[in-house]
Amino acid sequence: PRGLVFFLHGNRGNLETWTTGLDFYRRVNFDLFIVDYRGYGKSSGKIESEAQLHADVRAAYDAIAPRYRGKPIVIYGRSLGTGLAVRLARDVAPRLLVLVSPYTSLVAAGLRRYPFVPEFLMKYPIRTDAMIGGVTSPVLLLHGSKDTLIPASDSEALRDLVRAPVELVLIDDAGHGDIHR
């Protein structure tokens, strides 16, 4: 393989739902490594804290990355996985960081969807906006122009906070769940 795509899925995804794009990765000769968070897919356990979630992602990365020493590694986050991808990319500096439908923070995303829920009840704030300025790798942001779950304005806000080379691509007529079509 030429390199690795380290994939962090969204809330509705798991290892099984993302294997549909495998042909693309085969064609470009990149291996795909998908992390299933605790309690997702066939992974057991329960997410107890944001710190635990970040630690799990880092442990998975540390287990696979040495096999690709000297080869490009792309960290790819989708929706929920974007905040986790930003934190990891900030710490390990991959060749490229790809964020699809990213949020500025989970608290902000949650309050937009459920404005009646007190902010302190949001268990995992995952402040992407507070971390992305520390990323030194190039960043590609992809967002559906008709995303009603996480608005494209979140990608625009994140783009403005990135200090590394950054590109934002808005996908016309795509929403949150169909951006990969």
Placement of each model-derived feature along the sequence:
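Primarily recognizes the serine-hydrolase "nucleophile elbow" in alpha/beta-hydrolase
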Residues: 63-114
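Active-site nucleophile elbow and catalytic-triad environment of alpha/beta-hydrolase enzymes
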Residues: 117-131, 136-137
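Short alpha-helix in the alpha/beta-hydrolase fold that links the catalytic acid
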Residues: 21, 128, 137, 151-160
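Short beta-strand/loop motif that positions the catalytic acidic residue
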Residues: 134-136, 141-143, 147
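Membrane-embedded segments
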Residues: 1-63, 67, 71, 89
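Catalytic histidine-centered segment of alpha/beta-hydrolase-like enzymes
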Residues: 174-181
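Alpha/beta-hydrolase-fold catalytic nucleophile elbow
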Residues: 36, 98-101, 171
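Short, flexible loop segments at the rims of nucleotide/cofactor-binding pockets, characterized by
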Residues: 9-11, 74, 116-122
